[in-house]
C-alpha cells in the first residue's frame, strides 16, 4: 500500500450531537459541561430553556462527503481514513491508498477537491502502461493512455529532486521500459565505451538523452546544451575504424551524421604463400653390371660330332 494524504475543509454541519445531557428531565444546573474532544465544536447551546448547564454542540466528520473518491478500476475504495487535521476541526485529513487511484476520473476528482498534488502525480504517472506500439512506457510517454496529457503537464511543471526520485524508481523497477533508455544509459555498453573517451554532456551525443526525444530525463538533462562539441563524432568514427563498436551499435544511439563516415580501405589481401617445391625423389642405385657369360662347351655335341666323323672314316675304309 502506498499512502497519500491531503487536507480539506468540512462545511457540512448536519451530523451534530450535544457534548452532555441537554434535555428536560435529563439534566440540571449541576450537570457537568461536556467537551467535543477532537470533533468540531460549533458553539454553546442552551439546555432545557436555561434550567440546565449549557453544552457544546459538536459535529462529526462527514467522511464520505468530505473525502470520498470514485472507486478504482477494480471497484475498490481508495479511502483509508478521515480524521480531524492537526490544525483541528473543521480541517479534515483524508488518507488514501494511492495504488487504488488508478483512473483519470479519480485523479481529476482529487485535483478538484485538493488542488495539484505532485505526490499523487508521481505515483499515478510513474506506472507502466503500453503505448500504441505495444511497448512498456510510463504514462508520461504514453500516446494511448488517457492520462498521457495530464502526466506530461506534471512532468514539465514539477522538475526537482522528488520528481527525479520518482523517475529513477520507475526506471529501476522497469529496466526494459522504452522511455528509460536515457536514465538507464549506464547499462548500455555502447554508452560506456564512448563515455570513457570524453566528458561531453550526454544530451549532445547520446540519442536517448537528446532534448527532442520522448524519453524520461532527470533535472538538467532536459536542458538543451548550447555548445555541443563536434569532436565526439570523430571519436565515434575512430572507434568504428578500430572495431571497438559497429555501425549497428551506434547508428541509433549516437547523435552523429554517419553519412559523413568514410570507412578505412580494406587491408590488402595477403600474398598467398608459394607452394613448397616437392622433394626430388632419390636416384635409384645403379644395378651391378652382370658378369660376361662364358661359352658353355657342350660335351655331348662334341662327342656326337666326333662319333660321326669316326663312323664316316670307318665306312670309307671298308669301301676301299
From Swiss-Prot:
Residues 261-294 are annotated as: Disordered. InterPro entries: Pox_virus_G9/A16 (IPR004251). The chain crosses the membrane at residues 301-318. One of its GO terms (cellular component) is host cell membrane. The keyword Hydrolase does not apply. It is a single-pass membrane protein. Keywords: Host membrane, Membrane, Transmembrane, Transmembrane helix. It is found in: Host membrane. Residues 262-294 have a biased composition (Pro residues). This is Uncharacterized protein 002L.
Amino acid at each position: 500500500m502506498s499512502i497519500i494524504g491531503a487536507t480539506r475543509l468540512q462545511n457540512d454541519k448536519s451530523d451534530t450531537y450535544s457534548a452532555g445531557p441537554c434535555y428536560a428531565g435529563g439534566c440540571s444546573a449541576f450537570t457537568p459541561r461536556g467537551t467535543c474532544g477532537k470533533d468540531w465544536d460549533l458553539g454553546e447551546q442552551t439546555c432545557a430553556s436555561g434550567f440546565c448547564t449549557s453544552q457544546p454542540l459538536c459535529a462529526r466528520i462527514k467522511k464520505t462527503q468530505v473525502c470520498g473518491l470514485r472507486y478504482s478500476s477494480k471497484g475498490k475504495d481508495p479511502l483509508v481514513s478521515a480524521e480531524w487535521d492537526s490544525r483541528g476541526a473543521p480541517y479534515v485529513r483524508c488518507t488514501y491508498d494511492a495504488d487504488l487511484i488508478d483512473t483519470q476520473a479519480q485523479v481529476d476528482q482529487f485535483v478538484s477537491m485538493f488542488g495539484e498534488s505532485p505526490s499523487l502525480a508521481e505515483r499515478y504517472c510513474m506506472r507502466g502502461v503500453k503505448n500504441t506500439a505495444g511497448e512498456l512506457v510510463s504514462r508520461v510517454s504514453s500516446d494511448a493512455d488517457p492520462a498521457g496529457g495530464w502526466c506530461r503537464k506534471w512532468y514539465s511543471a514539477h522538475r526537482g529532486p522528488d520528481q527525479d526520485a520518482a523517475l529513477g524508481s520507475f526506471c529501476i523497477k522497469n529496466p526494459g521500459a522504452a522511455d528509460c533508455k536515457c536514465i538507464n544509459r549506464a547499462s548500455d555498453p555502447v554508452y560506456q565505451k564512448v563515455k570513457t573517451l570524453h566528458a561531453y554532456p550526454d544530451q549532445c551525443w547520446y540519442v536517448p538523452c537528446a532534448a527532442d526525444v520522448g524519453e524520461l530525463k532527470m533535472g538538467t538533462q532536459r536542458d538543451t546544451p548550447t555548445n555541443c562539441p563536434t569532436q565526439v563524432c570523430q571519436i565515434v568514427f575512430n572507434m568504428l575504424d578500430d572495431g571497438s563498436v559497429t555501425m549497428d551499435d551506434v547508428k541509433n544511439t549516437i547523435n552523429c551524421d554517419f553519412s559523413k563516415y568514410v570507412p578505412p580501405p580494406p587491408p590488402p589481401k595477403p600474398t598467398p604463400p608459394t607452394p613448397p617445391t616437392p622433394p626430388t625423389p632419390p636416384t635409384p642405385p645403379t644395378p651391378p653390371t652382370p658378369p660376361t657369360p662364358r661359352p658353355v662347351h657342350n660335351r655331348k655335341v662334341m662327342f656326337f660330332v666326333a662319333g660321326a666323323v669316326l663312323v664316316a672314316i670307318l665306312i670309307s675304309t671298308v669301301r676301299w
